[in-house]
């Protein structure tokens, strides 16, 4: 790295930072996607049940009885919240990928030998 100009070293450090941010973002996105899939599946299953079905939900370390209508409402809210979160993460991922692409291009341009003309 001693032959690399300080400006390029700085860009390389920024590139590494972006890559780490992207990795964390992808992990968050996967977690939210998994939660969303689970919530949708639970909602799908609950909606198949009769209205008077006995339903239990976990609250912390407890399991409590709830009504079907309340469980459906809570799950729909959870799905909506997770979809909003997922969309936000996807937008962030897209922006970060664009920054990575731009910075990579800048670094490559900086490292190319000048063209004699």
UniProtKB/Swiss-Prot annotation:
Location in the cell: Cytoplasm
Domain of life, per lineage: Archaea
One Pfam family of this chain: Prefoldin_2
Sample GO molecular function, one term: unfolded protein binding
PANTHER family: PREFOLDIN SUBUNIT 1, PREFOLDIN SUBUNIT 1-RELATED
Subunit structure as annotated in this protein's UniProt entry: Heterohexamer of two alpha and four beta subunits.
Family affiliation: Belongs to the prefoldin subunit beta family.
Protein name, as recorded: Prefoldin subunit beta
Organism: Thermococcus gammatolerans (strain DSM 15229 / JCM 11827 / EJ3)
Protein's gene: pfdB
